[in-house]
A protein has these predicted regions:
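Cell-envelope and extracellular/periplasmic
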Residues: 21-458
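Bacterial Sec-dependent N-terminal signal peptides
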Residues: 1-23
Length: 458
């Protein structure tokens, strides 16, 4: 797929859907999914100072708005319970009709390359088990996909120093070709909740490999962090590295979409922020709070993925472990959030793990339990609660372990224990059969004071 780099001072203020006077942003188009049972905003351009009418086929109702002197207009429509397909007819004297519109559940998915990685994989980097799913994809399955940067098989990487009104993208049906190009984690998530909820599902995907969270933050949200230089946003300097430049991905790939109603957010990012985990600890809550404020729909759920093990280069080999520790704290600090663990899907030499199904499904468990109120299955990982020291052992208690602990391997790996000298040694860990706690010990530490788990990159 050909990649073009575009610095977005968008001349395409709104992408054309036809030769009609009414024009719409790319996120409003044929094949889209609108959030069910919601007040949904529709907006666009028309002739200046004109009356714009919008008729929705699900209720036969006509809504009216007046365009301003520059032709901008917006209005809000009420959506019913999940269903479709429907039509939406826009009219400012000339008609524009959107076809094949579904009503269902919509999720916004963002992050860096592990969220971006498509079902068809990257070059020489496959995604395990997707070939059969891609081949069997059918338009009759009510999953619809929108990806920024992508249209007609071409990619235009979009970023901007200032917020823009529109971005390139299009809604696509569930066909083999389309599924092969969509984010694998997002698609597995959508596939799972669609099968369970039995409603249409739309995923809006906005990603860029190698990106720092700073690039995805708005100027308002990042301004309080005085250590971050924002001067490039105000001068004529060229943005040479958009993935590390504050605000430019927000401006080009999130700002144009904040009017579009969603149920919640999915996020898979962090690898590129290992160099300053203390800053990341504070950036993430600010980022999430700002996303929610920009969408203006209350405390929308935010489910994210803890980065997977990988042998990053580094002097001490613990930068990823520190980032994972910060991400755990993020889950505790950010209300209405949940974190998916990936300690069992990483690979020492492939930064893009081949198992995206496990990740997508685990995100779905969070959503089904916390957003949709389902019960009877596990969704949250065991999390450290407390510890007790008895003789030469440390006993660890966990939250989210009501049914006990179950190891992936025959013996537990990754535990280390230390005495007063704070020198950590590999430790033996075993699950107590009658409780949801671990006993950890080492023959090299007779009086332990500290224990840690998986505190290395891989």
């Amino acid at each position: 797929m050909k990649y073009l780099i575009s610095f977005l001072f968008l001349a395409l203020a709104f992408s054309m859907k036809s030769e009609a006077k009414v024009t719409l942003p790319s996120i409003l188009g044929d094949n889209m999914v609108l959030q069910q049972q919601a007040e949904v905003k529709l907006w666009g351009k028309a002739r200046s100072n004109a009356t714009v009418t919008v008729k929705t086929s699900w209720n036969g109702q006509t809504y009216k708005s007046s365009s301003d002197g520059k032709g901008g207009w917006s209005l809000t429509v009420s959506t019913p319970v999940a269903g479709g397909p429907y039509k939406i007819i826009f009219n400012d004297g000339e008609l524009l009709t959107l076809q094949n519109v579904l009503i269902g559940e919509v999720w916004f998915c963002s992050g860096q390359s592990n969220m971006e990685m498509p079902m068809g994989g990257f070059d020489r980097q496959p995604v395990r088990g997707t070939n059969d799913i891609i081949a069997k994809a059918k338009p009759s399955t009510p999953i619809r996909m929108y990806t920024t940067d992508s249209k007609d098989g071409r990619w235009v990487r979009q970023f901007s120093k200032t917020p823009v009104e529109d971005c390139q993208g299009e809604w696509l049906e569930n066909t083999p070709v389309n599924v092969s190009h969509i984010s694998a984690v997002s698609y597995y998530f959508a596939r799972y909740i669609q099968e369970v909820l039995e409603v249409p599902v739309g995923i809006v995907v906005s990603t860029w490999g190698g990106s720092k969270v700073e690039a995805w933050m708005s100027r308002e949200s990042i301004k309080p962090f005085s250590s971050i230089d924002l001067s490039i946003l105000d001068n004529d300097a060229e943005v040479k590295n958009p993935t590390a430049t504050p605000c430019v991905l927000y401006n080009g790939k999130i700002a144009p979409l904040t009017n579009f109603a969603v149920r919640g957010f999915l996020w898979y990012q962090g690898e590129s922020n290992r160099d300053n985990t203390d800053l990341y600890l504070n950036l993430m809550p600010a980022f999430v709070a700002d996303l929610r404020a920009k969408w203006g729909r209350g405390e929308l759920p935010f489910y994210f993925v803890q980065i997977a093990p990988f042998n990053y280069e580094g002097a001490d080999g613990t930068s990823a472990a520190r980032l994972r520790e910060v991400q755990l704290q993020n889950m505790k600090d950010i209300p209405n959030s949940g974190m998916v663990t990936t300690m069992d899907v990483g690979h020492p030499v492939f930064i893009h793990p081949v198992d995206k199904e496990t990740v997508g499904n685990r995100l779905a468990y969070w959503a089904l339990a916390q957003t949709y109120g389902m019960k009877g299955f596990g969704y949250a990982p065991p999390v450290y609660k407390s510890m007790e020291i008895q003789e030469n052992k440390i006993y660890i208690n966990f939250d989210n372990a009501q049914r006990g602990l179950s190891p992936m391997w025959t013996s537990l790996k990754g535990f280390e224990i230390a005495g007063e000298d704070k020198v950590f040694y590999p430790a033996f860990a075993e699950i107590e059969t009658t409780t949801a706690r671990l006993a950890v010990s080492s023959d090299k530490v007779s009086h332990p004071v500290a224990v840690r788990y998986a505190y290395k990159n891989y």
